[in-house]
């Protein structure tokens, strides 16, 4: 039998070879049915009992795992527990039971689908992927409704590579590392909580393979290449031996990376770079430190708004930000203000549906049109500044008028707090995202108004190249090293250094080791990324001289195409540390 190769998405790096275990995680197929009015009360009670049972199960899991792995990975369970208390989920299902006379299963499925639609149009991939958390919680409730017990991964006795349609974060927590070598799934993305948890636990994984469950049966020999998102089924002898060598080399390299965690990200000639983490929840702060990061370069605040029917209060804002500031102290925490549109945060009817939300009323535009929402968040952030080193980051600023207006609102909020006798840091630093080409083009003007720039490459690349990277027909054109993108980045860097303000990056580009030396050479001082990328980028930083990085950036900038720029970067990396290239 010839080997078969399946390509998906890199979720968590690593190479494992073993026998497959096909896990049944297909969704329960249950048709909704109408019920009689006399049964409505009982159906609502049945649904609420299932909610309570689901909550009990997750609380027990949390208690069980808190002893062995500490608190840094348990925030995902907290997220699922919070979803079980979500008003949109509970009230939406109860309403459908009462008004549409649907059974609990049918009402729940309709509610989950309706909530999912809100997430589908969110531009931010990380936030959009939270839809999977809602679906996974819904699946748990549904299984409890019908009394369908799920096969537990903790029961697996032999070493295996798990193959499944999808895997919930709770499944990942139950994976015993002495038995579960890694996993591959049909569904999923790099930003799913399952993928994030796999990286945090050091469990190799590939997701988004589409039909891997149809190609593999339990007992098949498989190679899981989590570095490239590849699964090889029934490998031939040459491939098998080649991957054994790669596996040994990777394990050695991992041990070398582990040694770097407590060391600073310092070039060979003494230039120190801040490597920081992107987070969503307070519980993720510990993981940043565990991976050798120094603070939070991007704290997404949208979680406070999503999946609810009431706006977060000032106290909710304050408590969330205070907790992160205290956990991260003495390092800095960069808090990004709300970065989605009004139609995505659970308050229908605020605005009409937009034909093109990516270019519509979102982020700072939304905040300036809804000043009450914006001011409440700013009050919470400012009050939290007394608890740590907090900085404020404004997203999607396109020009000076927006920036002037945000500064005016902030000054008004400061004045309010002073009059109320509420403490805050009067000198809190203010920064703005550079993620729109217009902002990059006038970055010299904008730099005079802020303390720092943070470049959001995900949107900047999409807007510059007019590409939707979720569109499979044009996604191949999404290229960070496109000459147009590089010239904008250099323009922003020149403006920041001329104004003597800090230059940071918090997009995916910041966490790619291939780009690290280029960004150093372009003058970036802070790089914020997914925590699992920190050791890899630190390896590059500690292996290069700043002079060489500047030379590389200049060389890459002179290339006429993205492919030539990439080849130039790869050659540079390979010449200086081939052991790293072998693992990329």
Task: Go through the PLM ranges and name each one.
Residues 1-327, 333-340, 370, 374-378, ...:
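Non-catalytic, soluble scaffold/interaction modules
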């Amino acid at each position: 039998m010839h080997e078969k190769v399946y390509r998906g998405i890199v979720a968590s790096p690593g190479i494992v070879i073993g026998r497959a275990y096909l896990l049944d995680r297909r969704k329960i197929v249950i048709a909704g049915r109408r019920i009689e009015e006399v049964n409505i009360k009982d159906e609502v009670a049945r649904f609420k009992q299932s909610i309570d049972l689901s909550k009990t199960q997750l609380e027990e899991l949390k208690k069980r795992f808190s002893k062995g792995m500490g608190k840094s990975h348990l925030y995902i369970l907290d997220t699922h527990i919070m979803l079980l208390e979500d008003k949109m989920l509970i009230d939406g299902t109860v309403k459908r039971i009462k008004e549409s006379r649907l059974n609990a299963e049918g009402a729940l499925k309709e509610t989950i689908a309706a909530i999912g639609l809100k997430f589908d149009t969110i531009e931010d991939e990380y936030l959009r992927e939270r839809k999977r958390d809602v679906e996974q919680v819904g699946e748990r409730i549904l299984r409890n409704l019908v009394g369908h017990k799920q096969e537990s991964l903790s029961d697996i006795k032999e070493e295996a590579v798990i193959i499944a349609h999808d895997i919930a974060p709770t499944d990942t927590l139950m994976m015993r590392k002495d038995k579960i070598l890694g996993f591959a799934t049909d569904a999923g993305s790099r930003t799913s909580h399952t993928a994030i948890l796999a990286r945090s636990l050091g469990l190799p994984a590939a997701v988004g393979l589409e039909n891997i469950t149809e190609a593999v049966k339990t007992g098949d020999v498989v190679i899981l290449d989590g570095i490239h998102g590849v699964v090889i089924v029934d490998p031939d002898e040459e491939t098998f031996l080649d991957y054994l060598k790669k596996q040994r080399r990777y394990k050695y390299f991992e041990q070398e990376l582990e040694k770097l965690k407590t060391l600073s990200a310092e070039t060979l000639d003494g230039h120190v770079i801040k490597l920081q983490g992107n987070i969503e929840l307070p519980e993720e702060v510990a993981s940043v430190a565990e991976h050798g990061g120094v603070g939070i370069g991007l704290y997404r605040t949208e979680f406070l708004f999503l999946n609810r029917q009431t706006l977060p209060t000032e106290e909710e804002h304050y408590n969330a930000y205070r907790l992160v500031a205290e956990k991260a102290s003495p390092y800095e925490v960069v808090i990004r203000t709300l970065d989605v549109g009004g139609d995505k945060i659970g308050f229908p009817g605020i605005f009409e549906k937009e034909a093109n939300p990516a270019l519509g009323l979102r982020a700072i535009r939304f905040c300036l049109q809804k000043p009450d929402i914006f001011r409440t968040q700013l009050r919470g952030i400012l009050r939290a500044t007394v608890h740590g080193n907090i900085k404020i980051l404004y997203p999607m600023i396109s020009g000076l008028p927006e920036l002037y207006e945000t500064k005016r609102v902030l000054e008004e909020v400061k004045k309010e707090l002073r009059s109320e006798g509420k403490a805050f840091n009067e000198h809190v630093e203010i920064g703005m995202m550079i993620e729109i080409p217009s902002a990059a083009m006038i970055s010299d003007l904008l730099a005079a108004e802020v303390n720092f720039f943070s470049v959001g490459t995900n949107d900047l690349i999409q807007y510059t190249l007019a590409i939707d990277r979720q569109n499979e027909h044009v996604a191949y054109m999404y290229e960070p090293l496109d000459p147009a993108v590089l010239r904008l980045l250099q323009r922003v860097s020149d403006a920041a250094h001329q104004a003597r303000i800090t230059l940071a990056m918090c997009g995916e580009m910041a966490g790619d080791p291939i780009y690290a030396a280029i960004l150093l050479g372009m003058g970036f001082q802070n790089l914020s990324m997914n925590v699992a990328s920190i050791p890899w980028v630190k390896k590059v930083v500690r292996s290069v001289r700043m002079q060489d990085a500047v030379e590389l950036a200049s060389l890459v900038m002179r290339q006429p195409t993205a492919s030539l720029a990439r080849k130039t970067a790869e050659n540079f990396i390979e010449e200086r540390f081939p052991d790293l290239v072998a693992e990329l």
